[in-house]
């Protein structure tokens, strides 16, 4: 082949509009998509990467008919290519079409190998390992979309990236599923059938991760479950058991005793001292207090300023219409300015930032607790003033954090948050200068407890995966990596931001 005769399909034509349409549809897919594994800010659509890899490895002449008028061959070739690529680039993908695409790539690769080596190379030679597969290198792999699609199309893929987050994502997306994804009767595990020695074998990566994930949940529940107690149902009329202090897992709702609610969210607001020196009240920095906006059910928190006091109360107000609430739940802090509910003084954004820089923006006020009622749909909203005894004790929790850090060596994250204009999240303007500042004491204790449990799970797995044939620390490391990614996702959702 001459250089001109080996022009690739991507150099001549790809149905960009059709690929873009499918990529847009793929973007809305959440369940089972690799983008849900871990946040990466430069995710590439899988279908677009599939088209790019296929187009880069298949010759431009692949779909050009051999017979017919020369002036029509090019247009016919483009039409044929468009039809096939539109079938190929569907998410998640048709296995039959993908297999056909693999054949196209291997046929082209076999032809190139034949010319390069001077020996006849067939597709069967490549499939059976007598000749190498086409190699695809992505030097800036990021979320791993291009290497993943290269693997899907039967290539040998290599992924590089200097960013450690990208490296973790690539391990979980590309490496570990290939090495440990399938059940292995020759390796120790916790979820597979027992071998002749009576040892439990490796049941597959997904099952092992689920097993150890449940192990971590049980351990964390035993350590900090008392901080998330069940709450007595104010509408329950029957006899209820003694007050429960243990947190029931949401997957085990049948075990929740009658007369209790399961807390699923605690709603907080940051506060600042009133700008008026003669007032000095605590001003909530909350923009809106909507809890529910559904047909025939409108629920919001009403801010009440009791005379003679310095802290507001939040009352749960419910109505069948928005007007029936009697107040505007969205009429609070606006544009970074907060109005004192006691004296009406406006705390502008500059004042709020100055208070934060002085370290006086680290106090919170619990507004409400959101619960579920076992066996029933919908949420139950309870005012914090009606459930004050169930609010966490920050002083006691801080002591538990110190004890946990001393026992495990896991400190509260003190790394500074980047402050340059390009990458900053601007929290430093409010005095939140380290990652540890972004969490309440209970959130921090929860995250540290999970981190410690994941570390212990890896140690336990390394011991249990040990066999007479040798230790398998990499399998335990793979499981722990997925669990660590889940803790990271938890940190994204459970912060004060």
Name what the model sees in each region.
Residues 1-497:
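S-adenosyl-L-methionine-dependent nucleic acid methyltransferase catalytic domains
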């Amino acid at each position: 082949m001459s250089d001109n005769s080996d022009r690739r399909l991507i150099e001549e034509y790809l149905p960009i509009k059709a690929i873009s349409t499918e990529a847009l549809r793929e973007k809305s897919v959440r369940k089972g998509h690799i983008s849900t594994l871990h946040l990466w800010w430069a995710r590439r659509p899988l279908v677009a990467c599939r088209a790019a890899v296929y187009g880069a490895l298949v010759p431009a002449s692949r779909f050009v008919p051999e017979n017919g008028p020369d002036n029509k061959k090019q247009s016919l070739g483009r039409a044929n290519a468009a039809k096939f690529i539109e079938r190929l680039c569907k998410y998640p993908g048709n296995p039959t079409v993908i297999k056909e695409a693999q054949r196209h790539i291997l046929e082209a690769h076999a032809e190139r190998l034949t010319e390069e080596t001077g020996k006849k190379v067939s597709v069967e030679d490549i499939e059976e390992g007598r000749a190498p597969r086409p190699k695809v290198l992505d030097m800036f792999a990021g979320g791993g979309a291009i290497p993943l699609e290269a693997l899907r199309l039967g290539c040998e893929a290599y992924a590089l990236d200097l960013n450690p987050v990208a490296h973790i994502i690539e391990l979980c997306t590309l490496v570990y599923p290939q090495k440990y994804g399938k059940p292995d009767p020759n390796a120790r595990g916790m979820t597979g059938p027992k071998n002749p020695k009576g040892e439990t074998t490796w049941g597959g990566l997904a099952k092992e991760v689920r097993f150890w994930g449940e192990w971590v949940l049980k351990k964390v529940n035993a350590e900090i479950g008392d901080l998330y107690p069940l709450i007595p149902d104010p509408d329950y009329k029957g006899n209820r058991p003694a007050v429960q202090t243990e947190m029931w897992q949401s997957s085990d709702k049948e075990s929740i005793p009658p007369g209790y609610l399961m807390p699923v969210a605690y709603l907080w607001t940051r506060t600042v001292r009133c700008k008026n020196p003669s007032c000095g009240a605590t001003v909530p920095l909350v923009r809106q207090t909507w809890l529910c906006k559904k047909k025939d059910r409108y629920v919001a928190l009403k801010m009440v300023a009791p005379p003679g006091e310095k802290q507001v109360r939040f009352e749960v107000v419910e109505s069948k219409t928005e007007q029936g609430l009697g107040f505007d739940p969205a009429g609070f802090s606006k544009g970074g300015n907060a109005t004192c509910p006691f004296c009406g003084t406006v705390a502008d954004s500059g004042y709020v930032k100055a208070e934060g820089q002085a370290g006086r923006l680290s106090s919170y006020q619990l507004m409400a607790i959101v619960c579920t009622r076992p066996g029933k749909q919908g949420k139950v909203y309870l005012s914090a003033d009606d459930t004050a005894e169930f609010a966490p004790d920050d002083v006691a929790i801080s002591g538990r954090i110190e004890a946990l850090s001393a026992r495990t060596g896991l400190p509260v994250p003190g790394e500074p948050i980047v402050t340059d204009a390009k990458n900053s999240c601007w929290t430093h303007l409010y005095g939140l200068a380290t990652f540890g500042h972004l969490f309440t004491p209970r959130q921090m204790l929860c995250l540290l407890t999970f981190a410690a449990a994941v570390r212990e799970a890896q140690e336990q797995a390394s011991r249990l995966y040990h066999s007479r044939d040798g230790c398998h620390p990499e399998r335990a490391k793979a499981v722990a990596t997925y669990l660590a990614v889940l803790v990271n996702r938890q940190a994204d959702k459970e912060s004060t931001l």
